[in-house]
Amino acid sequence: MDPMTWKLLGLALYLAVLLGIGVAASRKMEDVAEYFAASKSLGFWSVAFSARATGESAWLLLGLTGMGAAVGIRGFWVVLGEMLGVMGAWHLMAKRFNRLTRRYDSLTIPDYLEARFRDDSHALRLVSAGALVVFVTIYVSAQIDATGSAFESFLGIDWFVGVAIGFGVVMAYSVTGGFKAVVWSDVFQGSLMLLGLVLLPAVGLWAIGGIRPLQANLFVIEPHLLSATGGKGWTPEVIAGTLGLLLIGLGFMGSPQIFARFLALRDEREIRNGALVAFLWTLLADSGAVLTGMLGRVLLDRPGQPMIGTDDVVGALGKGGQDVLPLLVDHLMPAALVGLYIAIVLSAIMSTVDSLLVLASSAAVRDVYQKVLNPDVRDDQLVGLSRIATLVLGLLALGLALLVAFFVPGRTIFWFVIFGWSGIAATFCPAMILSLYWPRYTRNGALASMITGFLCVPLFKFVVPGLPGVGPVFGALEELTPAFLLAMAVGAAVSLMGEPPPVDEELREAAE
């Protein structure tokens, strides 16, 4: 068979498996608890792979590999930061959260927050739902954009056709199968991602002769690729940038798309094994991504030509190095395996899109319609409404992706991937951490944390970096870290200014 036939065969097989998962999961659909939380029946293997596949997105396959090509070993600060965040979420938060959500009978993160703070006004629920719909739409639109780019890069298919194919498949299994289909597909897709990010650098190291030749070649190309500071020393901007990379893992410590998996665990005893699986997955996949970029910088080097593209410069490895993985796959792998890597890149994208769409639909249907507008609605009606909401939110994200493609043709997807991720994390993570560990934390404090995080992400993205003096430091730090810390500080201050909440026996028992 010719190379294109192999590529299309691998893609068709991958898409067929996803559609089969959606059909199988839809046959088990009985009620809204099944649609949104898989009836809290998942084991550690499913939850660990699903949480990691969901938490990474296209950024792992295209963004982190590009970072490895652009900055070399400095990219390992991200690996360390993500490992710390993953372990913090599993070891410090998962058990308490799982215990409390069972005692509160929560199906969603807003369910948990409202029960934890006894918020009869539904303010926490409404703020949570609004933030999820806004930032999930942004995040998913970036992933849809990446789907079109993947089809374009690997197969030469028009961007719009690629978007239509990817969008149609992910909507089909997400709408029909709900959360269980999402988790099953995440296990499949997370396995593909891990396989691909271990196999490609292994083949690359074999081709180049090992680690020492890699180091020697990188030093000849650009010595700063072997420097943890990028060759600039520990200046304030470098320190801030390094902190920003290290603290990227904060986003795992409370983000609803991750914690929805902890909520669905069948038993808290699954957490220890799940933590180990998640840690190893992160170590291997993230390290493989950075190594892939570094190997691409050597194996695809073109002397005299810019390698890393910018807004003003066309680079051989694409803007920010984000084309290094597809180019290296074409360089090293036989045609039959190129088809596998198309599936792997799409796995990174779709495993995030499906999870976020079901999460946002739960916010709209469970947290607003059922809990606030129509408490008497039947479960069988909710499942149908949830499917409609998933479809509508997906169409909104598709519309945003098409608008961005039309008005900003020279875009890179990754700034608004990080923007959407940071928005979700800064809104929820401070409130989740304090709600699990600080009995003095109040309902008004939680509201203040969430609103502050929600507003500070665009502030630190678009306004603060342009300020004289401190602007470059905050620009290097990225928006998540300052927004996260400010949201936590404001929530603590508002809580201390108010009346102490009643003693929460369930919170005390969950900490034991």
Residue ranges and their predicted role:
Residues M1-E512:
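Membrane-embedded helix-loop-helix hairpins and adjacent transmembrane boundary segments
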